[in-house]
Amino acid sequence: MNVFNDTIVSRVTSEGKSSVGIIRISGKLAFEVSIKVLNRDYLPIRTACYLSFLDLSGKIIDQGIVLWFPGPSSFTGEDVLELQGHGNPIIIDLLITTILSIPGIRLANPGEFSERAFLNGKIDLAQAESISDLINATSEQAARSAMQSLQGLFSIYINNLIKDFTKFRAKIEAQINFSDHEINADNLDVFIEHEINRIISRIKKIRNTAIQGSVLREGIKVVISGAPNSGKSSLLNALSLTNRAIVTNFPGTTRDVIYENIIINGVLFILIDTAGLRITNNPIENIGIERAWNEIKLAEHILFVIDGSRSVQNQLKNYNNFIKSLSKTSCITIVFNKSDLSKFKINSDLRNLNNGVLVSSKTGVGIEALRQHLYFSFKSSFEVNNSEGVVSARRRHINILSMVLEKFLSSKKDWKKINNIELLADDLRTCQDLLGGITGKITSDELLSEIFSEFCIGK
């Protein structure tokens, strides 16, 4: 159902010169553009036509392909007209200026075509967000997972979970109103406990899928840590094939956080070089060390670098202290660096310690093996297999699923304590409402404005 009274227009191809430039018009006056700009009062539906594009005086501005999609069978659910001409910005601007001279047509806001598609019921909010994720994907895996969400896979997960809550709540409320005709009182506890545990398991599985999708979308954070002068910055440069980080023989050279993106087998990894961890009286270096710990807390994978040409035992003590100080369980790999030096002495026992990898940042030996180690560690920990079943998800989705899980775990405790069936039914309703925020069944205008404002012009 069309909920808008005005008509919008925008260029949908990128700015600058290109071989093709596309203009999209959506709304009640879309066909008015056909009459005024194309001099046509009839267009075949969803059929490409080669026509001239005219200004209001009848002069030809350009020639190209025209596509007509009458609503509701269009992307936005409204009448949609697309003009595909030459991609010269001058021509595009002339056409848009001509179209805007028709009363009732205005320029589209960023993301407004997708917003109209959502508000007209053509896509849900999770699918709308996946459009932006697909456009902005920085790796093959992220693009594939975004397409899965655009096709509705993540929405299916959420809607099926909502159905689980609905069925459970229906049983519970029937028990409240018609206790003599529903579940036998002796079996009520067993039924409720079984359903609670089953749904909790479903929430956890979907949340893990969402976390995986969020990581694919944003990139896997890999923090390079260790003592000063162990070769952390050299390792970042070697892994990224850049000279991004400054490398010197002086301990404490790196004092700020340095980021570099790399793609391994279609997956985005964000390498993060940090200040060497040590006790120092230098206030500037201490700021860098504090920032290093902030990144370590958020890392999906940590590369702890050990200088294989120096005393390894002391460095392993530092490593053990490092492990004890971590607040969460992270995937950690020890990287024995400087294998090209004659002083390098690492025995087989040390090599096997915590998936130890031997490298030389200077010569490149072992660097590709380390890159593949990062990928397969990610693949193993998240059980990724060519993105089958993996969806694009955002932090807000994970936050909502976490709130639902926390609420339902609390409901489980309350049920065991007081067996209040009305309270349980109310908790189920709350969880349903929270999940509705993912697909947009229950949402606020402020949230919609925030989401669609991130889209590019033309989407």
Swiss-Prot record:
This protein's GO CC annotations: cytosol
Cofactor details (free text): Binds 1 potassium ion per subunit.
SUPFAM superfamilies, A to Z: P-loop containing nucleoside triphosphate hydrolases (SSF52540), TrmE connector domain (SSF116878)
Taxonomy, superkingdom: Bacteria
GO biological process, one term: tRNA wobble uridine modification
EC class of the enzyme, as a word: hydrolase
One of the record's GO molecular function terms: metal ion binding
Transmembrane residue ranges: none
Signal peptide span: none
PROSITE patterns given in the database record: G_TRME
Xref: Pfam families: MMR_HSR1, MnmE_helical, TrmE_N
Keywords attached to this entry: Cytoplasm, GTP-binding, Hydrolase, Magnesium, Metal-binding, Nucleotide-binding, Potassium, tRNA processing
InterPro entries cross-referenced by the UniProt entry: G_TrmE, GTP-bd, GTP-bd_TrmE_N, GTPase_MnmE, MnmE_dom2, MnmE_helical, P-loop_NTPase, Small_GTP-bd
UniProt binding sites for Mg(2+): 233, 254
Occurrences of domain TrmE-type G (ranges): 219-379
Annotated binding of (6S)-5-formyl-5,6,7,8-tetrahydrofolate, by residue: 24, 82, 122, 459
NCBIfam families: mnmE_trmE_thdF, PRK05291.1-3, small_GTP
Job description of the protein: Exhibits a very high intrinsic GTPase hydrolysis rate. Involved in the addition of a carboxymethylaminomethyl (cmnm) group at the wobble position (U34) of certain tRNAs, forming tRNA-cmnm(5)s(2)U34.
HAMAP family recorded: GTPase_MnmE
Record's subunit section: Homodimer. Heterotetramer of two MnmE and two MnmG subunits.
The protein's name in its UniProt record: tRNA modification GTPase MnmE
Organism: Buchnera aphidicola subsp. Baizongia pistaciae (strain Bp)
